């Protein structure tokens, strides 16, 4: 899992001139990003309890079942990390229609 996530992040980094802007909608995937020493790529996270120190300045995009889509879009992410159940199907479809890359 970590290897796949790293490959996705590296692919995005290679395809873009700047570092990819990543929003994580799954706390477990957020932890993996931190473990991979890539917390600086995170521009938004889903609140799910106490935050690691590495995320103190990263904006929230909502809570489970209460995704703030307007705030998420204002962060202009290149990639959104999520578990299939972390976002309601209607919101996931909306993100897909907007052309934001999703990894689940």
Put a short name on every predicted segment:
Residues 7-10:
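Small-residue packing motifs within transmembrane alpha-helices
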Residues 87, 92-104:
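Flexible loop/hinge segments that line or gate small-molecule binding clefts
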Residues 1-5:
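Positively charged n-region of N-terminal signal peptides that target proteins for export
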Residues 20-92:
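A short, structured surface patch at a secondary-structure boundary
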């Amino acid at each position: 899992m970590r290897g796949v996530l790293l490959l996705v992040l590296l692919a995005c980094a290679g395809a873009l001139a700047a570092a990819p802007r990543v929003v994580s909608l799954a706390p477990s995937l957020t932890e993996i990003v931190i473990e991979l020493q890539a917390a600086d790529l995170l521009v938004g996270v889903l609140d799910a309890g106490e935050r690691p120190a590495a995320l103190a300045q990263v904006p929230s995009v909502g809570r489970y079942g209460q995704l703030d889509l307007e705030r998420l879009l204002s962060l202009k992410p290149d990639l959104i990390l999520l578990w299939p159940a972390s976002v309601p199907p209607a919101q996931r479809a909306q993100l897909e229609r907007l052309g934001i890359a999703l990894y689940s």
